[in-house]
């Protein structure tokens, strides 16, 4: 894991429109601007460490060289410059470069490289015999404390140390030194690659304090942000958060990062107004966790002020923060009546660790974070081809997570839609499988625009398993959700890639850009459409939806969408397909097409499975299988 938890809200010293520089400069040293020095096995990994550091903009790495003092080999000097550059000097074996913060491609802490003849130093806390370096790395990945390892091969000179696997950790998550040592290999834990088999506990426990060692503390607006900070701190295994109602004023909004020798809390104490939870570092699912887009009303974030500018709204203030060179978070003060043409004051701020230095309530401000990290690409957040405004037919690559599910019995036909949520997983509706006796008769086609493209020789994914929610009875009763595990993995391309699942912390997000897609009927008595159809539809409150369906119970596990006058909606054949909503430039799978009365009828909105209420179920099933 990369050191420093501040990755959650790191500072960018380059403008959003600044150039992304990926080139490494050989035999070049950046002079000055030193922040700190760490040890990394390669310049490439040094660049990743710089990217995840809250203040690092540039770096200089020293490679192994006869001309350099061996004590300087593998040093990674992290640097900062408010001018975005530093003087360059020639130096043999020096490799310099820039942080990836200003780049739009995927940034990941995952490092699967194995380093031959390198001993990465740290605290050796576990020694055991392993058959191979791969087995040693797997042990490290499945050990809650392990950051990296060193393995002595069968050719190691000392017979008694051959095949020994040393698991190691440090305070920063990076080695304290790296030295040359023949016949050993070293590498990092693959927890950041979502490959750990450790338990993943996503629940946040109210009225609970974990009474264990505090390794650090920061200020956070809610328990969800506290949990994300814990997840990206190399030593944090669990946390306790004191809410704004906590009795002791000086501890309100305090996020305590904790650890224990066993890896679990030793004692749980019942305390009102406290919440506790666990690091998600070991979870085997790639839900984006770096971005926190919520607004905090009647809340002021304190920190170093970068600038004070006029803004019409807190949304505009957040945009100013996102576009500012160094802004991490902001507080917006609404305008007084008839003052400054209705514009309020937008305070752009930063701190040394990326979190507010203090959080105050009751002063009328509205606070939030930069959205810069929301625009970082990930498997499910990669920029998708722009929507085509107007019309109903989609274009190729417009909805790359949409799949068409076919049955081959008695003849092959489109059965339902579905969404790619992982490289072996499709999320769809449970009611699609009424009468389906075996997954062997199912075929999943991805990257398809027209049903007519599907021929006998068109490639497809077989279905290994159908997982239906165990509380499902019928669509109108809820729990209309199912997972398909594919027989083979999906290789992500521009035309087939996953959509992000919503975060439990975003339950209160108001989505305004939502689309339903599918090959279903356009009216009640119709046929399956050849070309993938799309319709932009507004969400409807559950209270309003309940008024339209008095004969049914609209629960919080359902979400409704549609126009009061009708005209646009999902229909037969769209079942199981996505209700996709864009928020902060990221598409989320907000709903699964489930049921409704008729097709696009007046005052009869479509009813969808509310995906955010099933995130834990999805993760439990996809990790367990």
From Swiss-Prot:
It is found in: Secreted. It holds the Pfam family PAN_1. Residues 1-18 form the signal peptide. Changing residue 241 to L: In FA11D; dominant-negative mutation that results in severely decreased protein secretion. This is Coagulation factor XI. Keywords: Blood coagulation, Disease variant, Disulfide bond, Glycoprotein, Hemostasis, Heparin-binding, Hydrolase, Protease, Repeat, Secreted, Serine protease, Signal, Zymogen. Belongs to the peptidase S1 family. Plasma kallikrein subfamily. The gene is F11. GO terms for molecular function: heparin binding; identical protein binding; serine-type aminopeptidase activity; serine-type endopeptidase activity.
């Amino acid at each position: 894991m990369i050191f420093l938890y501040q990755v959650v809200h790191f500072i960018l010293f380059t403008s959003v429109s600044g150039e992304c520089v990926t080139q490494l400069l050989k035999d070049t040293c950046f002079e000055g601007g030193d922040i700190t020095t760490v040890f990394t096995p390669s310049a490439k990994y040094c660049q990743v460490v710089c990217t995840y550091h809250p203040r690092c903009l540039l770096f200089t790495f020293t490679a192994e060289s006869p001309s350099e003092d061996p004590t300087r080999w593998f040093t990674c000097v992290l640097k900062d410059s408010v001018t975005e550059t530093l003087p360059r000097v020639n130096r043999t074996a020096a490799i310099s470069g820039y942080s990836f913060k200003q780049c739009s491609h995927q940034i990941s802490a995952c490092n699967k490289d194995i380093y031959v003849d390198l001993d990465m130093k740290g605290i050796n806390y576990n020694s055991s015999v392993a058959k191979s370096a791969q087995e040693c790395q797997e042990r490290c990945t499945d050990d809650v404390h392990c950051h990296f390892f060193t393995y002595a091969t069968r050719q190691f000179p000392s017979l008694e140390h051959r095949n020994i696997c040393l698991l190691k950790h440090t305070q920063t998550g990076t080695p304290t030194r790296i030295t040359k040592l023949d016949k050993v290999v070293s590498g990092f834990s693959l927890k950041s690659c979502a490959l750990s088999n450790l338990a993943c506990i996503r629940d946040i426990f109210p009225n609970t304090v974990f009474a264990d060692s505090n390794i650090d503390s920061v200020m956070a607006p809610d328990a969800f942000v506290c949990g994300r900070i814990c997840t990206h701190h190399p030593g944090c295994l669990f946390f306790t958060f004191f809410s704004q109602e906590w009795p002791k004023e000086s501890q309100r909004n305090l996020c305590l990062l904790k650890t224990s020798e066993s890896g679990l809390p030793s004692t749980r104490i019942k305390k009102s107004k406290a919440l506790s939870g666990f690091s998600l570092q070991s979870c085997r699912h790639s839900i984006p966790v770096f971005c926190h887009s919520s607004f905090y009303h009647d809340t002021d974030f304190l920190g170093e002020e970068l600038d004070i500018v006029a803004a019409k709204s807190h949304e505009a203030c957040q945009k100013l923060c996102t576009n500012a060179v160094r802004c991490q978070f902001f507080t917006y003060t609404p305008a007084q009546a008839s003052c400054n043409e209705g514009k309020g004051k937008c305070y752009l701020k930063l701190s040394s660790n990326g979190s507010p230095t203090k959080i105050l309530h009751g002063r009328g401000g509205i606070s939030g974070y930069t959205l810069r990290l929301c625009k970082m690409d990930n498997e499910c957040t990669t920029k998708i081809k722009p929507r085509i405004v107007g019309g109903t037919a989609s274009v190729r690559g417009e909805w790359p997570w949409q799949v068409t599910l076919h049955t081959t019995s008695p003849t092959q036909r489109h059965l339902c839609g579905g969404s790619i949520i992982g490289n072996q997983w499709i999320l769809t509706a449970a009611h699609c499988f009424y009468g389906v006796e075996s997954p062997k008769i199912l075929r999943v086609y991805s990257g398809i625009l027209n049903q007519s493209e599907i021929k006998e020789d068109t490639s497809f994914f077989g279905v290994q398993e159908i997982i239906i929610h165990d509380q499902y009875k019928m669509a109108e009763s809820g729990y209309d959700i199912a997972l398909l595990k594919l027989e083979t993995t999906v290789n992500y391309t521009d035309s087939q890639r996953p959509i992000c699942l919503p975060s439990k912390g975003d339950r209160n997000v108001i989505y305004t850009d939502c689309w339903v897609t599918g090959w279903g009927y356009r009216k009640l008595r119709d046929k399956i459409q050849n070309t993938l159809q799309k319709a932009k539809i507004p969400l409807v409150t559950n209270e309003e939806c309940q008024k339209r369906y008095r004969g049914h119970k609209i629960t919080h596990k359902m979400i409704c969408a549609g126009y009061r006058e009708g005209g646009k909606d999902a229909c037969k054949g769209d079942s199981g397909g996505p209700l996709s909503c864009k928020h902060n430039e990221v598409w989320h799978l907000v709903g699964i097409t489930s049921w409704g009365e008729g097709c696009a009828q007046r005052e009869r909105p479509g009813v969808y499975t509310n995906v955010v209420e099933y995130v834990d179920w999805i993760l439990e099933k996809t990790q367990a299988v």
